[in-house]
């Protein structure tokens, strides 16, 4: 069995890699200097780059559906849903900028959570294997705990985060149990 992997085989996942790289850049920007406008702009630029790449690939006519490592299938429907996820994330990051601006401390981490959740959602729609599906689902849902409880000064926000954590943990356990019944 051949386990070598070249960069050309990973090319269909470049939009997801752009979003993941943007989250790393945002983390570094926060570590170096906290600037809410710079972090928000970097997030929007990264999401736009990924959306433009998907739109270009979809409309150039040179795209061939690709199976990446047997775990992800990138076809026109996958790219359409990834594009819709990016548009929704762009709307969320743009609209949340003014809302988060009113908070005094730790405004920038919301964008890291958003980018990680978007990367998980983009991988989720491309997954073609249960292991990739579950890992992508968790990558998408775990940052949502933090986003729900982000304004922890409000009791409803913290309560929502804890309730979602319990509900999601139960759902993940049931999902794993179902996968074990199918494959075991």
Each PLM stretch: what is its role?
Residues 1-184:
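Alpha-helical transmembrane segments of multi-pass membrane proteins predominantly involved
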């Amino acid at each position: 069995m051949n386990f070598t992997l070249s960069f050309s085989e990973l090319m269909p996942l470049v939009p997801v890699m752009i979003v993941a790289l943007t989250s790393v850049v945002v983390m570094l920007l926060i570590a170096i200097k906290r600037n809410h406008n710079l972090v928000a702009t970097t997030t929007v630029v990264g999401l736009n780059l990924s959306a433009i790449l998907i739109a270009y690939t979809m409309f150039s006519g040179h795209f061939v559906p690709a199976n990446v490592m047997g775990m992800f299938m990138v076809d026109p429907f996958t790219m359409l849903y990834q594009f819709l996820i990016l548009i929704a994330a762009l709307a969320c990051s743009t609209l949340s900028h003014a809302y988060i601006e009113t908070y005094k401390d730790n405004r920038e981490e919301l964008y890291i959570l958003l980018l990680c959740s978007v990367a998980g959602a983009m991988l989720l729609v491309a997954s073609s294997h249960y292991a990739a599906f579950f890992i992508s689902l968790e990558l998408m849902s775990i940052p949502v705990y933090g986003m729900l409880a982000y304004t922890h000064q409000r009791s409803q926000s913290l309560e929502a985060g804890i309730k979602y954590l319990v509900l999601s943990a139960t759902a993940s356990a049931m999902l794993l149990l179902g996968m074990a019944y199918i494959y075991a």
